[in-house]
Amino acid sequence: MEEVRRHLRIGVPLPCYFIGGSDDQRTRTILNKIVSITTEGGTGFDTHRFSGNVSADTVGDAAFEITFGGGRRCVVCEDLPFGSMGENEFKKFEQLVTEVSEMGGSTVLVFAFYSVETEPKKDSKAKSESKTGKKNRVEALKKLVDKCSGGVINCETPTTAELCTIIEKTCAK
């Protein structure tokens, strides 16, 4: 996590990110920071946002197209339903993450989850399988992003101590 923060601070994005957790505001703030440092402001033709049910081919087309400004492009996938996705489609997403991480920084691929539980329950007996018997694909995606030199960011609700620190820093300004 510290390496991800360092990259965001100096303005050099990693090739892939997985952002999720219970705090939507933190998730959106980090997502907007990544998009703005990737495409110099976060607006324009080099930013692609997908939400909900979208195919890996569509995301791949956006990731590998030629940029207008000659810089980096950012492809954001929000709340993709990996649990209901077919096995072949999920394998395409896995291949896409691997290919983007090998591209050398011309594309930044971000998976953001607001309404999907990204952390497995601590009391669950089967950590890798869901209630339907399928593997937990969100967890598999997190591991793949981490393995491919990407950033995994869990945005949990701040504790009381963290809130006090934020208030102290704000008041000190």
Each language-model region and where it sits:
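Conserved beta/loop motifs at nucleotide-recognition and modification sites
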Residues: M1-K173
